[in-house]
Amino acid sequence: MIDDFAALVDQQTYLSDYPYADTVELNVLIYGQKLRAAIGTTSGWPAAQTELMRALTDGPGMVVFKQAFGDLSVVDRATEAFLAQITAEKAAGVAGRDHFAKPGANDRVWGALDKLAVTEPAVFAEYYANDIIVLISESWLGPEYQVTSQVNVVNPGGQAQTAHRDYHLGFMDAVAAARFPAQVHRLSPALTLQGAVANCDMPVETGPTLYLPYSHQYEPGYLAFHLPEFTEYFQQNYTQLPLEKSNAAFFNPALFHGAGTNVSTTVRRMANLLQVSSPFGPAPWKPSTGSRCAGLSSRYCWKRKRPARPKAT
């Protein structure tokens, strides 16, 4: 088993196969100005989406967008709101914990998207009116997708998560996941797109997410990531990319990954973890009815602020 897995993750990513990417770093595709220029044209938007879908399936399974948010003040205001939410939840005794890390290592805001819509609707509208989120989400899932988010803060000294896969089978133990037939294991990743927005600068010492490119192609992976030999292989071969504030990484949920160890002494490394779900397979976490109603004014702003698609002339 491990030999088959190793053969898959030994694949290399070549920039020549991805004309809209700016570069390849540590086997991961990095997108920036070339993509920005392309998606402003009528033909470039769908062509870029086709390339991104290929990168997430046949390619490394992960892409990074430089300066996904052009206005850093929008990111800063969202960060302030998330930190205020963490403080409020701790004071109320309802602070969230990270299910893939030791208790106390990280801070979590579960359901961060709808909480932001309620507490800071203007910030919500500015933050999520983002063409890169639209581009990559529709590339993977098509229209009518649903976005949810959970904020994860790895505090100084916070230890790495164990390597895992995500929705939906990734949240089950091996016994539960084994009850589902093979075609469900193949289908599950197609129902969700995982993303992480860097809400602060993330040099390696702060513990940015660890990834294993091409690991999503291993079909038994939802069972294998529980096995110690796969955990050990991941720890010896992972990729860890530093990110700058406003960068965004998106990846196939079947990719083996986990937050890294924060060895810094002062930086609370904050990532806004996005789960973008197909209308045919919603995420287990759903925005509450009250939050959806309270966010109606933000939704109006979102539609007004959402970047226009290129139109034929």
Which residue ranges define each predicted feature?
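Conserved metal-binding segment of the jelly-roll/cupin
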Residues: P242-H257
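Ligand-binding loop in jelly-roll beta-barrel domains
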Residues: G260-A271
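Non-heme Fe(II) oxygenase catalytic core, chiefly the N-lobe of the double-stranded beta-helix
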Residues: A48-P60, A68-K245, V263-T265, V276-R299
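Long, low-complexity C-terminal extensions of enzymes
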Residues: K303-T313
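Gly/Ser/Thr-rich helix-start
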Residues: M62, A259
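ATP-grasp fold ATP-binding core
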Residues: F65
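Fe(II)/2-oxoglutarate
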Residues: M1-D58
